[in-house]
Amino acid sequence: MALYIGVMSGTSLDGLDIALIEQSPALRLVATRYIPMPDTLRAELLGLCASGPDEIARSAIAQQHWVELAAQGINQLLQQQQLPPQDIRAIGSHGQTVRHEPSRGFTVQIGNPALLTELTGITVVSDFRSRDVAAGGQGAPLVPAFHEALFDQRPGNRAVLNVGGFSNLSLIETAKPVAGFDCGPGNVLLDAWIQAQRAENFDRNGQWAASGQVDPPLLQALLSDPFFATQGPKSTGREVFNLDWLQRHLRARGAIAAENVQATLLELTALTIVESLQSAQSDTQELLVCGGGAHNAALMGRLAALLPQTRVSSTAAYGVDPDWVEAMAFAWLAHCCLEGIAANRPSVTGARGLRVLGAIYPA
C-alpha cells in the first residue's frame, strides 16, 4: 500500500483541492481537504495571467503565498488523518498555471516545490506539463490517462468531461487509444461575468444564467473565435478567454441585459462541449461530468438536452466525487513519475511519444 497526496489549484482560482489516495494497486480516495483561496492571493495570481510590470518579483511573491497555503492544507490533512509525513510516498503538486502557450514552447505553473518539500517533510513531484511541451505536445490536458485508469472498468464507450475554469474531454472507447482535448471556456467566463456584475464568486446551480435568454448574435460572435475551429490536439487558457475578451465582443454588440450575457455564456460552454464531442466522431454512450460544472444544474440540463442519445451524469455514478477527480489525478501522476510510468498520451497532446512526467524534490 502506498499513500499519495494530490494538490490541484485550477484556473477557477477558487481554492486548493487536496486529496489523499491509496494506490494498492487499485486507486482509492482516502480523505480530502479544501482550502479557499484568499482574495489577496487570488488577485496576485490573476494579475500574473496577463502581461504586467515586475512579473518575476510578483511571481516569486505569489508562489510563496501559494505554497504556504498548500502546506497548511496538507499538514492539516495529515493531522486530521493522524498520519506522519513519512507515511506519504509523495505529493503531486500541479501548482498554479499563470501562462500556457505551448505554440511558443512553454507552459508556466508556479508553486515552489522545493519549499513545499521543506514545509511538509514529504517528497514532492511537480512540473508535470513541461516535459510533454518539450516533446512537441500541448502539455494539456493531462487527465485523460487518469480518466482511463479510473473509469475504464465497464464495457462500452464513454467520455469524461471536466468542467473547471476550462472544459476538457477524455474519450474512452473500446479498442482505441484514449483521446482528449480542451473544448473551451468552462466556468471561467461565467465566473468572471457574475463577479463583475454581482460581486458573487460563481453562479450557484446556474440560476442566474437560467433567468436570462440566449442572445444569438452574441453567441455567434463568441463562437467565431479561431480556437473553436482548430482541430486537436489543442489546449487553451486565460491568455485567450478572459473578461477582456468577452467585453470586446460586448462593446461590438451594444447593450445586452447582464442575465442574458450569462445565459449566452452558459450556452457557449454547453455548445462547445457538444460540438467537440461530435467533431471527434465519438460513439459515446455516456458522458461523466466532474469538476465544478457537475454542480451547475442549468449546464447539466443543457448538455442532456443537446445529447439526447447519451446518458449525462456526474462521476458520482461511478462512486467518484466530482469535486476531487483532478486532485486525485495529480496524486496518481506523482505515483507514475516515481514508478517511471509514462503518463502523457500522444493521442491527446500531440507529443512525439510517451514521456514520464514530473520533476522530483526528495524529502
Curated annotation (Swiss-Prot):
NCBIfam families, sorted: PRK09585.1-3 (NF007139)
Catalytic activity: 1,6-anhydro-N-acetyl-beta-muramate + ATP + H2O = N-acetyl-D-muramate 6-phosphate + ADP + H(+)
Lineage: Bacteria, Pseudomonadati, Pseudomonadota, Gammaproteobacteria, Pseudomonadales
Top EC class for this record: transferase
GO molecular function annotation: ATP binding; kinase activity; phosphotransferase activity, alcohol group as acceptor
Protein name (record): Anhydro-N-acetylmuramic acid kinase
Record's keyword terms, sorted: ATP-binding, Carbohydrate metabolism, Kinase, Nucleotide-binding, Transferase
Gene Ontology biological process terms in this record: 1,6-anhydro-N-acetyl-beta-muramic acid catabolic process; amino sugar metabolic process; peptidoglycan turnover
Pathway: Amino-sugar metabolism; 1,6-anhydro-N-acetylmuramate degradation; Cell wall biogenesis; peptidoglycan recycling
